[in-house]
Swiss-Prot record:
Keyword rRNA-binding: yes
Protein species of origin: Synechococcus sp. (strain RCC307)
Protein name as it appears in the record: Large ribosomal subunit protein bL9
Family matches, as HAMAP family: Ribosomal_bL9
Molecular function, one GO term: structural constituent of ribosome
Amino acid sequence: MAKRVQVVLSEDILSLGKDGDLVEVAPGYARNFLLPHGKALPVTPAVLKQVEHRRAKEAERLAALKADAVAFRTALDTIGRFTVKKQTGGDDVLFGTVTNVDVAEAIESATKKLVDKRDITVPEVHRTGNYKVQVKLHPEVVAEINLEVVSH
């Protein structure tokens, strides 16, 4: 069996892993490609310490993002209801439909905080009334808001 060497990746490599991963590769691959092109670093105690420090900072950053998302979800729950005004015809039928852009604008006007329209899931809305809309604030945090569609 061939000898393998350990290196720490300094950038994402599709077939090996992500930046900061400790991987085992063939010695020639490390010596001829990864190390000269700056795609990996040889394993030393200093490099391992640096990688652990970077991982800890990244974990703190991700935890802070999640905490912000949870706080924003609480703020959305506190507001309770968001209103979108649309033009209607007879029997409260809308001309057009309510889109995720409309919901994003309603959230922004109420909270002064931007929400990406791609993170909003709106059910099919063709009449005035109340609807539940899901807003993905973080990969692990989803808020469900009440949307009131009214005629103007």
